[in-house]
Amino acid sequence: MSDIDDHVKETLSEVRKVGANYEEHQQEVGLDIPVDLIHFKKFPVVDSPGKYMKVGHDTRSDISPDDSPELPDYSGPFNGSLRFSDFSKDALINMLEMSDEYYRVCIEGWAESVAERYGRDDMHRIQAEAWRDTILPQLRGMIDNWMELSDDEAEALISETQEEVEAQVEAGGVILVNPYKPKAEWKQYSKERLVKLALGSHEFLLAAIESWALVIVMRDGLDEMFAFQWTLWSEKLLPAAKDIKSRWMKISGDPVEAFMKDIQVDATSFPGKAFEMTFEMPEKEVGVFTFNKCVSVDQWEALGRPDIAEKASHTSCPAAIIETAKMYDPNMKVEILAIPPRVSKDEVCCKWRLSIRDESDPEYVRPGEGSAKT
């Protein structure tokens, strides 16, 4: 069981909410959280901390419907300055459907893994606690930020959501309620409203994932949660996530280009309160993506624990990115240009470069030989 004291638990609960004001939670002395900072895999980093400062902004949330190319999907060329408003309204509905399916796959994955580790009865208790303590208290704020509803409509949606949650709890299954699941009338909404709904669906998805993770932290500590996430994403969720994005957004292209487009429309990393990214392809088979803002880094730095930010980054991001890269091409090379700890908050949170190995590379994979070493 976790030996995190009550004060630390309360602070963690507040600072790990999506959109938390980190300045309010800034710790002069690092928060005392038990964690193993020695026994974890550190991936090689190309450059030293302090090299890459934040440049540019995340264009995906820019809304400019008047000059939209009305993309039906993302089967066309990579666009480093992609705006979600570049998609047609039908494509944005597909993006929302993609986000909903992504949400369901993630939550079912968490539920299955929790049941395997703790038993099905504990899984039901954990998901009920996650909804009661984390998701529902944040729901009104998410609705007000993204859904453009009146007070009466917002309260009606919250009541409807609570009723659905209670019904699914009573039925004994996994709670998959999603107020951002597209409805028939959404097809009549403006493009601006659909983009906001897509961004809101991302915030809801993050809150749901975080709610499960937080319960595990409170029960068994950070190390258990880090190990849990590593296994869950690398073994269970990544193939499904790649398939979901490919089907709904028609992602295509050469391997690096396709993976760059995959990342741009990944519902777990849409722009907003948690993430801000930039994307570029300086050469045909070279892609670079940068997190200028990352909720995990911001949280741990606010708590005075950049050392935990380092562990969190190494135990979650590389596994997901490297494994997905291999799905696109076993010879796709992933290089970490920057990763926590940072020298200052003006520095990027992390930076990654994708390329394709040639036959001179000692890790080149010949057809039929399997995967490259990581």
Question: Whereabouts are the PLM-identified features?
Answer:
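Long, well-ordered alpha-helical scaffolding segments within enzyme catalytic domains
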Residues: 317-321
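N-terminal accessory segment detector
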Residues: 2-288, 295, 299-316, 326-349, ...
